[in-house]
From Swiss-Prot:
Residues 35-70 have a biased composition (Low complexity). It comes from the Eukaryota. It comes from Saccharomyces cerevisiae (strain ATCC 204508 / S288c) (Baker's yeast). GO terms for cellular component: cellular bud neck; fungal-type vacuole. InterPro entries: PRM. This is Chitin synthase 3 complex protein CSI2.
Length: 341
């Protein structure tokens, strides 16, 4: 569907017709018509403009007379006359009265705010504290806490250092006096140099003890090196009995292998010199010296054996040529061994 072509002139003509109809409606309502004119600020140019319109509709007519350039609005009707005037003064107020109508204009000039001086004013509070008091107090508390922690850390380190130094001295004394220099074939100075290399250790236990090639055995106190060190010649039987440890099975096992060791060695060579370091005698060597009469484990000499009434077992052993050097302390073990034989 094709729309009809409308020219611009037709549109303008329709707009004029609508404006004319509105003007006629206003005139029919007996409303005043307003006309305004502007006057230039220059005093040399005094141009004026006037407009005169006349319309007739039926029997009523409205005529607008001349309107000058002084912002005057006139009408033939009995409407009030409104006159406005503007002044360039900053502190002037103007009001005009015309037929019970008032229009007033006002103007305000901006001004700067005056701040009074606080020096010497008794009505104002004067602050005497320095700026940043809260931050200064917080920093002081934090510094006190850090300083106390640092002091406690230093005190604990000094205390631990003193305790470690004291333990090191005790360890040196232990290595110097509790070891047998003749048995271990080492000097005291070597022990001190060895312990000084481990001065960083705080306990006296494992590292120093593990570095030694050998330690004191159960029979060290009964060894001949201790006798040489103390320069005291005591009986081997007393040295053996000074130990509280008794192992019958160990005695029986080592007796078979080392039965002739004590007889081959010279007993006087043990006590010959203090400078020599003889080998520590074994338990079988000490016990091999004992006879049946002096053996502390021979319970038959004290009539403590339950088979003391029955002399068949010892007699049979003597008759067979199997004479025991000693008897074990356990009667039950003795019966088991006799049963095996």
């Amino acid at each position: 569907m094709r729309l009809p072509e409308i020219s611009i002139w037709k549109v303008i003509l329709l707009l004029h017709l609508f404006a004319l109809q509105e003007f006629q409606l206003v005139s029919a309502a007996n409303l005043p018509s307003l006309s305004s004119s502007t006057k230039a600020a220059d005093s040399s140019s005094k141009g004026s403009s006037s407009a005169k319109t006349t319309t007739s509709l039926g029997k009523s007519s409205v005529t607008s007379k001349d309107v000058s350039s002084s912002h005057n609005v006139t009408s033939s009707t009995k409407m009030p006359k409104i006159t406005t005037s503007a002044s360039t003064s900053l502190y002037t107020n103007s009001s005009l009265w015309s037929n019970n109508s008032v229009i007033s204009t006002s103007s305000i000039t901006p001004s700067s705010v005056y701040i009074p001086v606080t020096d010497g004013n008794k009505f104002l509070y004067q602050a005497h504290h320095p700026n940043g008091t809260v931050f200064i107090a917080f920093a002081g508390c934090l510094g006190a806490i850090l300083l106390s922690l640092t002091g406690a850390w230093i005190a604990l380190n000094i205390k631990s250092w003193r305790s470690a130094r004291k333990e090191n001295k005790l360890r040196n004394l232990e290595n110097q006096y509790q070891h047998d220099p003749f048995y271990f074939q080492t000097n005291i100075n070597d022990d001190e140099s060895e312990t000084s290399s481990h001065s960083d250790d705080s306990d006296i236990s494992e590292k120093v003890l593990k570095n030694n090639s050998s330690r004191m055995s159960l029979y060290t106190l009964g060894s001949t090196s201790v006798l040489n060190l103390l320069n005291n010649k005591t009986d081997a039987n007393d040295n053996f009995r000074s130990s509280m440890f008794i192992s019958p099975t160990e005695i029986l096992q080592s007796d078979a292998n080392n039965s002739n060791t004590w007889s081959q060695s010279n007993e006087s060579a043990i006590y010959d010199s203090l400078s020599s370091t003889p080998r520590e005698p074994g338990a079988t060597q000490i016990l091999g010296k004992f006879t049946d009469s002096t053996n502390p484990f021979n319970y038959t000499s004290y009539n403590l054996s339950p088979d003391s009434e029955d002399r068949s077992t010892p007699k049979s052993n003597v008759s067979q040529g199997k004479v025991k050097k000693y008897r074990p302390p356990s009667v039950h073990l003795d019966q088991l061994l006799d049963g095996k034989e």
